[in-house]
């Protein structure tokens, strides 16, 4: 990097304007050589950048380096592409004027690489968003796609552009790229069918064969070996060490997806590329009449499938020619030479039109879409021109003629904008100036493009005139028309010495870049660009969507003769010149250091030739004698008026006087500027940069002042708006409150009136007079009921209803009780439910009948009063599988003597069992239990009545239990004898056995006493606990 060098003299000056001997061409070239040796490939001539192709990678294009040049004044950093790119970008943003960067130089000088580096710089340094990033990617990825289809390896350049490209990049008001458009010029279609020795066809053919997947190649009917294809072997240079076709194929496939190609479009596009290769392999043989016949049917099959046409129709179209004369169709066979011409013409037409379609497809992808960038309608444009350089080959044909004509037009533009226009401007503005001599190539441009007498006009005339026109007749017409032109020479017009270097079918033009000898062979054919009608018809019927778009059916019906290739190119160049003239140009002049494409090799002779024909010395002399910056007074004053108190904020006088006051305030020295008639001219860039720096500082203070003023204005405006809003809200709110209050009063009066009237009619049937009162009464009762509902089923409270709601109140009370009961039942556990069921049965049996029942109510019934451990194991064993449901200790009284004996009463699933220690004394099946008797007193005796016909039973059983209510309830439920419990008053009779009866007498007394009476009865004295 230049910034790392301490001795600037050792590496030359970075601006040729600083050369002491600026008129010496040798000094100019020596300065280039010094810098090239130190890898300093960029040098300025004022604002023009001179670039020497290093033929090697240099570490000067990193993102860090891009940031170094971002937003920095032109001369504050060392010369670089990025400086030119950034200067154009800043001019575009600050002055809102379209810019263009013109990159010129001969083939191999590095123009295409320069274009890519500039696009990369904008992609990194411009403002970004998701949509903008998409546009950036598409702009960058359009390059590898167009290079694959439009670039090739030539003798002088391994990546030579064989078409001209002008790209417009659209920027929004923030400086972000939002779209783009590409114009292409004169694709070298002849390369599809013919290449010179050491050259290749277009890159895409080799990339497809080298990088294409096996499945893809099989579908396209291709093999990986390029030697198998007639159109790829003519240059004998299928593989090049500096080109990696396989990697480039991956780049192209990725780029196609980024610029919105779907899979079907890629397949159709590659089918067309493959069809060109197959078309080149179509061979012909002559029949007995000398007419051509296709000998490679296999190729026709592939072509029919790839181009989506009828194979037989395509075959016939390749060996026949259709002519329409006076409304009649005439079909004539072709000979071998004509058939080969037709095949090659079709291959060139397919590829050329597909390339144009491809450019249009890329343009659709790059097009600025307002929907994606809402509100960004104002856009400016920066153009990049990358067009073929001046070409001189051993054999120069129609393509070189057009390319060199294009370079003449660009040189003319350069002269117009930098040399001639600059000197004319000094004269018109009255600025003292020493004229600089330069060669004006307008004379050469006129020789080529002049109407009626120019080479293109003569060529078109020969192509269009009736009769047998040939390349030779064209040359003769040239000799006749422009024989006296100083820049034109042929074998016939040359002197004896010159004739030795000129063939009889050649002419020589003395271009601004030197002499070029052109062979007229093929000029007429290439200018006509003829494709037989039946081949056009075949392509128009193709079902391949791309081919269908490329070959328009209107061509078949349009009787107007199409423009020739040279005229189309001339008109395209004319439009391009108009585009470039409308923009503010920046120049990059590219130089090729040697023809061998070797790094670190400086061919002084070759470079001197390029310096001369690029007009760099004339450009340098103009820059040394002239001024670096000039602007109209109005523009200059508008931009810098804020730097002077007298001109800010407005100047009411003449702009000339305002600028004079401004530069005086800025302290410009007399030698630093000149005042013209309509413009100010500033000689030194440093003067302008100092002014720009002062403006940047001033902008900060102005921005602060503007912000303060705006904030004050905005706050005051906001305050006044809030004040007005507050007054409006207060007024509205006071009105609202008043209206609410009036409405409330009116409602109150009406309510009171209706209430009183309803009260008067309260006992009448429902009518309009009392419906409001009745509704209010109903509502009040329901609200009161809501607040005073019973809390549980035992709560019997209920609000007293009005007379009209008695029936409804009763229904509601029932519903409420049902709901509480349902809620309570839903909440109780199975154990508690069982307890309640037993209590309910006990209530049904004993309530109001048994004196000691009330004392049993608060006591819970127990599942059993004896555990298994309290029952003898022998008893349990004897019961086997019978589960004991309830067990309780009891006292048994003998049937005769009424002796009391301790026993256990067990209830099983099927029987009542009485147990004495380890022995079962008596088992009474529930079926044999006829009833149970108990007294109404508070004693605990009860009698189990047994069926008398059962011989196993000894008679009824008299028992006493401390839990008589519990025991009898469980026994009744188990035996299903709830209705068979008898509660007796006075005495109970029971069966003793053998038809005898016993009697138990019950007497009220002060305390419990059980004894045998003298009359043989069992007397039970029991205290009365409750009065009935």
Swiss-Prot record:
ATP binds at residues 53, 61, 104-113, 157-161. Residues 699-728, 722-751 form the IQ domain. It is found in: Cytoplasm; Cytoplasm, Cell cortex; Cell projection, Ruffle membrane; Cytoplasmic vesicle. Residues 12-696 form the Myosin motor domain. Myosins are actin-based motor molecules with ATPase activity. Unconventional myosins serve in intracellular movements. Their highly divergent tails are presumed to bind to membranous compartments, which would be moved relative to actin filaments. Interacts (via its IQ motifs) with CALM. PANTHER family: MYOSIN, UNCONVENTIONAL MYOSIN-IC. Binds directly to large unilamellar vesicles (LUVs) containing phosphatidylinositol 4,5-bisphosphate (PIP2) or inositol 1,4,5-trisphosphate (InsP3). The PIP2-binding site corresponds to a putative PH domain present in its tail domain. This is Unconventional myosin-Ic. It comes from Gallus gallus (Chicken).
